[in-house]
């Protein structure tokens, strides 16, 4: 028993469980002075925003202090990564502390937009001042977002899985209810349900295959002359971005939806804004095509976030490693980036076919939105499970060795 509790993996797992208890407890703290009987308070975007909030640690059904979730922080990370590719902006040339502070400022800006959009549309009880309730709930939602960011940082340093665990628990708690409500709303024949179940098994197999498949690049290390040198490889995933594109595209596309809600409240009689908001509503052709395009774009962007050729080449150069037939430095960087680009396109096409293709059915019936999101949900869920599994495996690696004395 003592050996079990002395394990690093067990200690980190217990700490993560404690943080999850805090998260579940906080998600049950309801915003004050709100009429909970009104469900469709965000108009035509309620179903999508509730689903996307559940994927990012939020919950728009219970209207708790964690309703917005980690969506502002995730959207800020996306924008920061996109801006970081520009050398002119010089975002990565500053210290880590300054970069983190700027990321938090960007998170605060997006959190204000999303929290204010939700608060302005909340069904406030008539016996209280609407202005004070909106102001208080906006502050509470912003505070809830930053509290979740803090929990994620704590879990990343002292627990297992980082922010992934919070997102995973939110999905487990909320997504099954979404799927059941869809089956109750939309009549689907039994034969179609059986076919969907079989396709789910096939998709799960393909997903595991894509996540575990690796392209091995032989690497030589200076001074290494033994029989193990042939086992030195640089591994590149067949789908380098994994399930991150789907997770972040849901968060990223929710920002315009919140922004349209906020602008619609500020300018209620603006015909052009109303027309644009209607065209970009969830399930409309413009939104579906933007969703598929952004999903493919994020598959490429996050592939380079996961495997940056410049960083890998610099690390190999410092450790005395090189790829056969490729000069160290800039040539190695270009070689790796070409491979990452090639596999990111393959991964992007896989993501678009599996997670973007079902979205085309939404053009015929918007009620199928939640069902169309299930394949992408599997991709996201699978990526999280594999990430946590690899982290636990790495933590337990040192415990497999026995002391010499």
Curated annotation (Swiss-Prot):
Listed GO biological process terms: intracellular protein transmembrane transport; protein targeting
SUPFAM superfamilies according to UniProt: Preprotein translocase SecY subunit (SSF103491)
Entry GO CC: plasma membrane
Consequences of knocking out this gene: Deletion of 15 genes (from psrP, SP_1772 to SP_1756, includes the accessory Sec export proteins SecA2 and SecY2) and infection of female BALB/cJ mice, shows the psrP-secY2A2 region is required for lung infection and for infection to progress to blood. Mice infected intraperitoneally showed wild-type infection. Decreased adherence to lung but not pharynx or brain cells. The psrP-secY2A2 region deletion has no effect on bacterial growth rate, capsule levels, autolysis, or transformation.
Protein keywords: Cell membrane, Membrane, Protein transport, Translocation, Transmembrane, Transmembrane helix, Transport
Pfam families (alphabetical): SecY
Listed transmembrane segments: 14-34, 65-85, 104-124, 131-151, 156-176, 191-211, 247-267, 285-305, 343-363, 368-388
Superkingdom of source: Bacteria
KW Signal (keyword) present: no
Protein localization: Cell membrane
Protein topology in the membrane: Multi-pass membrane protein
Family: Belongs to the SecY/SEC61-alpha family. SecY2 subfamily.
More info: Encoded in RD10, a pathogenicity island with an atypical GC content that is associated with invasive pneumococcal disease. Pathogenicity islands account for greater than half the genomic diversity observed between isolates. The main function of this island seems to be correct synthesis and export of pneumococcal serine-rich repeat protein PsrP.
Record's subunit section: Component of the accessory SecA2/SecY2 protein translocase complex required to export cell wall proteins. May form heterotrimers with SecE and SecG subunits.
Primary role: Part of the accessory SecA2/SecY2 system specifically required for export of possible cell wall proteins. The central subunit of a protein translocation channel.
The protein's name: Accessory Sec system protein translocase subunit SecY2
Gene this chain is encoded by: secY2
